[in-house]
Amino acid sequence: MIRQIQKRPAGSNANPLFLFHDASGTISNYLALGLLGRDVYAIADSRIKAKGDESLQDMSRRYYALIKSTVAEGTILLGGWSLGGMTALQVAWIFSRDPKVNVAGVLMIDSPFPDYRHALSLALESPPSEDGPASTRSDIEKAMLQTVTMLHKWKIPVWRREPQPHTVMLCAGNDVDSDHVALSLVDQFRDSPTLGWNERAGPSVVNESYPIQGHHFSIFDPRNIDSVTKTIVTVTAAMEMMAPEDDEDY
């Protein structure tokens, strides 16, 4: 499911930003963001209750098709929180084969390198919800565990024919205050400015990093939302300035 959650101001030529869901499959966090000055679309996981395994590559191909149905050609930005940042990276790789769409940048919002080798049965991407029907909580928690398995099998894309889009990491400034082993996994690379990516996946996966307020699970809380909103506005504007003009490529 793709949903437009913000519209660009009249007269603006800002490129659209597509944000991918976290491991729960939901996009509710993005609704808290302040105005970003561009069209913003959020993609939720419409198959959260579906049975069977799906690779991140397969899921990303579905999302590529969704975006193409919205923007057939031109320049776009991709991003997301946690799992959403990794999905953005994979979808960007798919778009590198598309001559009609240019990805100007990838925005990873506190998306730590997915090293869950020692905690596949524990590593939840976000805390289980205490709200809503028990069946809904069960579906979400199952989806989170499936995500950990999916990331364990994921082969991080390598750009060979085209350069990787400019990729920026927004890093939460605080650790999660929890004794839960699963929750602490999001902080295992907190000392790295790229949250473990450049040390473990290659020296140029993440080009820049910016600090934001809060810990992994409080980024979108009211007290922190201005920090992440302002940083996203700054980063996405810079990405557009660095991107080649459409008519130079097409």
UniProtKB/Swiss-Prot annotation:
Q: Name one GO biological process term.
A: biosynthetic process
Q: Which Gene3D superfamilies match?
A: alpha/beta hydrolase
Q: Organism's domain of life? A: Eukaryota
GO MF terms here are: hydrolase activity
List the InterPro entries hit by this protein, alphabetically: AB_hydrolase_fold (IPR029058), Thioesterase (IPR001031)
The record's annotation in SUPFAM superfamilies points to: alpha/beta-Hydrolases
Q: Which family does it belong to?
A: Belongs to the AMT4 thioesterase family.
What's the protein called, per UniProt?
A: Thioesterase FPSE_09186
